[in-house]
């Protein structure tokens, strides 16, 4: 085994290692950022809807499912009885 092969083999692995690290960092950032995004969305949705209807903040649930090709945002808001009358009188 020549000395040149030792150096040429390592030079080729550096880009591969860099790419793997970038993929790992991107994956960790996406997982780390998800709860922050969900909390921000939840707070903004809560603020908009609560302008029109009194809400219990504990009754607002926001979920995000990330698929291979599509991400789905699900918002579940439990409205109190009589909320439909509040919408009609506000409009």
Curated annotation (Swiss-Prot):
Pfam families attached to this UniProt entry: MinE
GO terms for biological process, alphabetical: cell division; regulation of division septum assembly
UniProtKB keywords: Cell cycle, Cell division
Superkingdom, taxonomy of origin: Bacteria
Family: Belongs to the MinE family.
Function: Prevents the cell division inhibition by proteins MinC and MinD at internal division sites while permitting inhibition at polar sites. This ensures cell division at the proper site by restricting the formation of a division septum at the midpoint of the long axis of the cell.
Protein name from the UniProt record: Cell division topological specificity factor
Organism: Bradyrhizobium sp. (strain ORS 278)
